[in-house]
Regions:
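A generic short alpha-helical patch detector that favors 3-5-residue windows
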Residues: 38, 66, 70, 86-89, ...
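Conserved alpha-helical segments that form or flank metal/cofactor-binding pockets of metalloenzymes
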Residues: 67-80
């Protein structure tokens, strides 16, 4: 399976699993005006939370990236959440955005924190009803699933290129390592 097929398969799988349908898309698109009217507050509060994290702030300082870059990332994610259509091209845009974030040094936990902090601020500043909250969570889940798939795709490529390990071998090693850690977790965490 090539890169595009793998990414698109995950996008479709995530949409189905999360129950994203036309109603979800309509709800998100209808909410975009609420989000846009609170955009500055949402982005500012999210930036403040993220930049309070020393690791996150350190990554930006190390790379000489300005706060405007963080703002751009958050605004791009907002656009993808509320104006995207969960199509194949939307899935590819999320993969490209994620590859760029990984390229500048964002580990998965930072991607997760970005999504949850941003979602929290969206809810805090837009006062959504329960159907809107559900749609926000669905969009967040879909974006995050596609971000993680992009990350794992890069990780598998690294193993394949540097060690000659196939995707199946990588997954087997992952499972075996998880089993070993699981068996020893009490000793490791004591």
């Amino acid at each position: 399976m090539n890169l595009r097929e793998k990414i698109l398969k995950n996008g479709l799988y995530s949409s189905l699993l999360l129950g994203i349908n036309n109603q979800t898309k309509t709800t998100l698109h209808d909410m975009s005006h609420m989000v846009n009217s609170s955009r500055d507050e949402i982005v500012h509060a999210s930036m403040y939370s993220l930049l309070q994290n020393s690791e996150f702030a350190g990554r930006f300082r190390e790379r000489g990236l300005e706060p405007g870059y963080v703002r751009g990332i958050l605004e791009n994610i907002l656009d993808e959440m509320f104006k995207g259509d969960f199509s194949e091209e939307h899935t590819v845009r999320i993969a490209r955005m994620t590859f760029d974030l990984i390229r500048i040094g964002f580990p998965p936990r930072m991607l997760i924190m970005i999504m949850f902090i941003l979602s929290q601020e969206i809810v805090r500043h837009t006062y959504p009803n329960s159907n809107q909250v559900k749609a926000i969570l669905q969009a967040c889940g879909w974006l995050l699933s596609n971000m993680m798939e992009s990350y794992f795709t890069i990780e598998e490529e690294v193993f394949a290129n540097s060690l000659g390990i196939t995707s199946a071998s990588y997954n087997r090693l992952l499972k075996l390592t998880a089993e070993k850690i699981y068996r020893n977790i009490d000793k490791e965490l004591a």
